[in-house]
Regions:
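Accessory cap/linker subdomain of secreted extracellular hydrolases
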Residues: 51, 59, 123-124, 128-229
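Short beta-strand/loop motif that positions the catalytic acidic residue
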Residues: 230, 236-238
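Short substrate-entry loop that stabilizes the transition state in hydrolases
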Residues: 28-32, 37-60, 65-67, 72-74, ...
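Glycine/threonine-rich phosphate-binding loop and adjacent beta-strand/alpha-helix elements that clamp
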Residues: 5-10, 293-525
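N-terminal cap/lid segment of alpha/beta-hydrolase-fold proteins
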Residues: 1-28, 395-397
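Alpha/beta-hydrolase fold nucleophile elbow
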Residues: 101-113
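Alpha/beta-hydrolase active-site loop
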Residues: 81-99
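Short glycine-enriched nucleophile-adjacent loop
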Residues: 114-126
Length: 525
């Protein structure tokens, strides 16, 4: 790899803006197929937090182009987020294909922001020959900033401040850069984040999304890939603990509806920590479509990592049981009292009162939204008296659960707004004090009528898990999940953010008569 060489080149766009790219070349004279990544974090980094270095891809026979998007890194212009990317992507693709070392074949890769830059372009733009978007989505609401109406507090503020720090560095605002950095390291950003974004990046995406999340008439944007692009060979990569997973599933469905044949891979990954083998899998896909000798793809359509058996499986949309929640009213004060009853059992009319104290909110652990994303043991959380817990009897035979856990529940509340934070877990057979959290979900209820009962639906993060004979299934419900989401103050005139004197103690009544836990299909189409 020592003989791999690189150079920087400029692309001047139609409006005169210059975009800077770093181009890594294999040994020899080419021409070669091109792998393109367009990203906002600096071409020197090249997403090496999750991807192999560009020199590795070049050593496999690819010309690798890492481009700084408009207004970032070494590129000119003003950074305006996703709105700029359709036009800039189209012009970049045309330029890349004109490079003398390019043999005319183009593949794209990258995750998160870099994932979306692969999917949006001007009408009429020829598509890449193959595309590997990872951990991304099209809806700026549901796939980029909010879940169940609640803003991704830790993630959204943290990412927004990263971009704000880059802006400060670009402007040589060293004081601002240090203030942002110190707030991130001290965790003060969880309390000061809104003000810092307003101060240092008021036109940024994160600040805009944060304000939209509390607006009564939000105008959210959803990006639309060209159907011709969705018909091309497409490998979509998701992680069970990644916040953009629902976005990846949405793109998969849209590609199917467009007439494409997308491949889907969901592994044991957070946004920044992937599994061994992810690089080789992507290389195999590129080789299958960009190198003549491997033209036939051997990929199955949907490959999923089983969270409990720790292995890869094909998707099987099998019918799963449903459960209802039962309690004699003590499911929060006694973590062994609440019961998950099979759907064949008769439902019981009962109520559990859950008190949310904003002074001591339930911390978010593990999952896809917290600051400790991944697998987690929530035993210590479930024994708290402000968490309502419902546990099944031991499973009688192996049970495979694939899909989107969805909880249907009626509630009322003594405040005008509140949150429901729900976790689904497995309690392994004969393992003491272990409650392995598999999935979480949230629903933010705003402007409700105090004391009026209403039906709620909480959709959790998708899963694939096999419960062995003797294992038990658990649902845990609380009124907070800090700092994955901001604290709901119980008053609509105040924002949901860090704990403050404006936050009220809130009593949430869970009415169990019509409660139901079911698993909806991973793919709806």
């Amino acid at each position: 790899m020592n003989s791999i060489r690189y150079r920087d080149e400029d692309l001047q766009l139609r409006d005169g803006t210059v975009l800077k790219s770093r181009i890594w070349s294999p040994q020899g004279n080419g021409p070669w197929p091109v792998l393109l990544m367009r990203q906002p974090y600096g071409r020197e980094i090249a997403s090496t937090i999750t991807y192999a270095h560009p020199s590795w891809w070049a050593s496999k026979g690819y010309l690798v182009v890492i481009q700084d998007v408009r207004g970032q890194g070494g590129s000119g212009g003003e950074f305006s987020g996703f709105n700029q990317e359709a036009s800039d992507t189209s012009q970049t693709h045309n330029w890349v294909r004109s490079l003398p070392e390019c043999n005319g074949l183009l593949g794209t890769y990258g995750f998160s922001y870099q994932g979306l830059t692969q999917l949006i372009a001007e009408e009429g733009t020829p598509p890449p020959d193959c595309i590997i978007p990872a951990m991304t989505g099209l809806s700026e609401d549901e796939h980029w900033s909010c879940e169940g109406g609640a803003f991704w507090w830790h993630l959204g503020i943290g990412w927004g401040l990263q971009l704000a720090a880059q802006k400060a560095q670009r402007e040589k605002n060293w004081k601002g850069w240090h203030e942002i950095r110190e707030n991130l390291e001290s965790k003060k950003y969880l309390y000061n984040g809104h003000d810092l974004l307003e101060k240092y990046d008021p036109e940024g995406m994160a600040y805009k999304w944060l304000n939209l999340s509390s607006s009564k008439t939000p105008q959210w944007k959803t990006h639309k890939p060209l159907s011709s692009w969705l018909k091309k060979p497409l490998l979509l990569i998701g992680g069970w603990w990644d916040p953009h997973l629902k976005g990846i599933l949405d793109i998969f469905e849209k590609a199917k509806k467009a007439g494409g044949n997308p491949k889907l891979l969901i592994g044991p990954a957070t946004h920044l920590q992937w599994w061994e083998g992810a690089q080789r899998t992507q290389l195999d896909f590129f080789d299958s479509h960009l190198k003549e000798k491997n033209k036939e793809s051997h990929f199955s359509q949907i490959n999923l990592w089983n969270l409990t058996t720790k292995g890869w499986e094909l998707s099987v949309q099998n019918k799963t049981p449903t459960w209802s929640l039962r309690s004699e009213g003590l499911a929060s004060i006694n973590h062994l009292e609440g019961f998950l009853a099979p759907n064949s059992d008769l439902e019981a009319d009962s109520e559990v009162n859950l008190v949310h104290d904003p002074w001591r909110p339930i911390p978010s652990i593990g999952g896809h939204l917290s600051d400790t994303a991944g697998e987690a043991n929530r035993y210590q959380l479930d024994i708290r008296p402000d968490v309502a817990v419902f546990t099944s009897d031991p499973i009688l035979k192996d049970l495979r659960l694939e899909g989107i856990p969805t909880l249907f529940l009626e509630t009322n509340c003594d405040r005008e707004c509140f949150d429901l934070f729900v976790a689904l877990s497995i309690i392994p057979k004969a393992v003491e004090n272990t409650v392995t959290q598999l999935s979480t979900g949230v629903l933010r209820i705003a402007n409700c009528d105090k004391g009026i009962t209403s039906a709620r639906e909480i959709r959790l993060q998708p899963i694939l898990a096999t419960f062995k004979k003797g294992d038990r299934l658990r649902i845990s419900i609380s009124g907070s999940g800090w700092p994955a989401i901001g604290i709901n103050p119980g008053q609509s005139k105040y924002l949901c953010e860090g704990p403050s004197p404006n936050c009220l103690v809130t009593t949430i009544s869970l009415l169990l008569l019509n409660s139901k836990l079911k698993f909806e299909s991973l793919i709806s189409s």
